[in-house]
Structures are given as C-alpha cells and as structure tokens.
Curated annotation (Swiss-Prot):
GO terms, biological process: protein modification process
Species the sequence originates in: Syntrophobacter fumaroxidans (strain DSM 10017 / MPOB)
Pathway the protein takes part in: Protein modification; protein lipoylation via endogenous pathway; protein N(6)-(lipoyl)lysine from octanoyl-[acyl-carrier-protein]: step 1/2
Matching InterPro entries: aa-tRNA-synth_II/BPL/LPL, BPL_LPL_catalytic, Octanoyltransferase, Octanoyltransferase_CS
Annotated positions for site Lowers pKa of active site Cys: K141
PANTHER family (alphabetical): LIPOYLTRANSFERASE 2, MITOCHONDRIAL-RELATED, OCTANOYLTRANSFERASE
Other facts noted in the record for this chain: In the reaction, the free carboxyl group of octanoic acid is attached via an amide linkage to the epsilon-amino group of a specific lysine residue of lipoyl domains of lipoate-dependent enzymes.
One Gene Ontology term, aspect cellular component: cytoplasm
Recorded GO MF terms: lipoyl(octanoyl) transferase activity
EC id: 2.3.1.181
Positions of substrate binding: R77, G78, G79, D80, V81, T82, Y83, H84, S144, V145, G146, G157, I158, A159
Entry's family note: Belongs to the LipB family.
Name of this protein: Octanoyltransferase
C-alpha cells in the first residue's frame, strides 16, 4: 500500500509566510505527525541568500531594492543568491528522505528530473550541468535548486522560471555565478504558458518520481492539522 502524502497548491504567497509554513511542517514531519507534503507556490518579488550567500552578489544597492519593494532574506537552504517572483513555479517538498531510501544526491537529482520532465511536456529539452546544480537549456539556466535537510527531512526546493520577468535576475549574480543567463519556458516557446498547465505537469511528474498516495489539500486543512 502506498504511503499517504499531501500536495498543496498555494498560489501567490509571501516568501516568509511560506518559509514559516515549511518549518512548521518540517517539525511535524520529523515526529511523524504529518505525512510527506509538497507545496506548490509563487512568490512576490523576493531575493534570497542561501548558506553560501554573499551580498556582494547583489548588483543593486539596499536602497534601490527597498525602493523597488524587494526584500532580501537570509535563509538556511544550500546555494547562493536567487530571485523569486511572479511567473515562477516553486516546489517545496517536505519529505523524509531516509524513509524514502534517498541520499541527498539522489534527492537533488530527483528534483532536477522533475523539472526536466515538466520541460519535456512543453517540448523543451532540459539538462543537468556537471558543475552546477539546477536545470539548464543549452547554456542558459531555467531552474534553481537549493535545499535544506535536518533530521533527514527536507525543506526548501526548486524554482522553475515559467513566465518570469527575467530582467529581475539582473539585480543579482544568479546562484553566485557571474555571467549566467537565465531563461524561462515562455521565452523559449515565444508565448506565455498558464500556471495551471505547469502545475498539472509538476503534479504528474511528482507522482511519477515519488510513489505515494498523493492527496490534494488546502491551506486551511493543513493549518487545522498543524494546530491540532
């Protein structure tokens, strides 16, 4: 029998609010109060700095970022600096890796495989880069991965550019890599794609890669479970 797991499509959600939700789910998953849970979310404009993050990778001044209404958040995930914003599909799995039989490397590869599968559904050939994690199309990067794992339970995850305004990546050296060009599904196709199309594809490949009894849940349902 497949183990139960939850899938939540949260739509647009403030970065810090989603981070708090991840931490609460993580704490409950560690003690087996909740099953594996995956959050699908989109964020307002936000820049995050991972454990290797350095503000020298910011090309805009703190004053300019404040004027633009873009917060800079130091977080516990791996990796360097990245941008989140409208038109980006972000996947946050809170999974017990040991129970899943996954090493850290296996898990990151699975996240990359998920995105490569999604891109394939849109006729785009994604690939890994032997030197840098994430997913690439040709020489351009389309998805960034940065995870945190504590007591064998994951949080944070992977962000895929769908209809993202790529100009915002000009505010940073993406993932700490100078000269990296970012791309998106809409840029490669020459047309916009709907968020619902992307989310359906993500859900399909999530089920393909992580065999669970995936059950869709709403935020109020999860909040009730966490507060029980």
């Amino acid at each position: 029998m497949l183990r139960k797991a939850f899938l939540l499509n949260l739509g647009m959600l403030d970065y810090n609010r989603s981070r708090d939700l991840q931490k609460r789910l993580h704490a409950r998953r560690v003690i087996d109060v909740v099953p594996d849970t995956v959050l699908l979310v989109e964020h307002p404009h936000t820049i995050t700095l991972g454990r290797r993050g350095n503000r020298l990778c910011l090309k805009a001044s703190p004053e300019d970022l404040e004027r633009m209404g873009i917060p800079v958040v130091q977080v516990e995930r791996g990796g360097d600096v990245t941008y989140h914003g409208p038109g980006q599909a972000v996947v946050y799995p809170i999974l017990h890796l040991r129970e899943s039989g996954l090493s850290l490397a296996d898990y990151v590869s699975a996240l990359e495989s998920l995105v490569i599968g999604v891109l394939g559904d849109f006729g785009i050939k994604g690939r890994r880069n032997g030197k840098n994690r994430g997913v690439w199309v040709g020489g351009d990067k389309i998805a960034s991965v940065g995870i945190a794992v504590s007591r064998w339970v994951s949080y944070h995850g992977i962000a895929l550019n769908c209809t993202t305004n790529l100009e915002y990546f000009g505010l940073i050296d993406a993932c700490g890599l100078k000269g990296v060009e970012m791309t998106s599904i809409s840029r490669l196709l020459g047309k916009d794609v709907s968020g619902s199309e992307v989310h359906r594809s993500i859900a399909f490949h999530l089920r393909r890669l992580f065999e669970r009894d995936w059950q869709e849940r709403t935020l109020p349902e999860i909040e009730a479970l966490l507060n029980d």
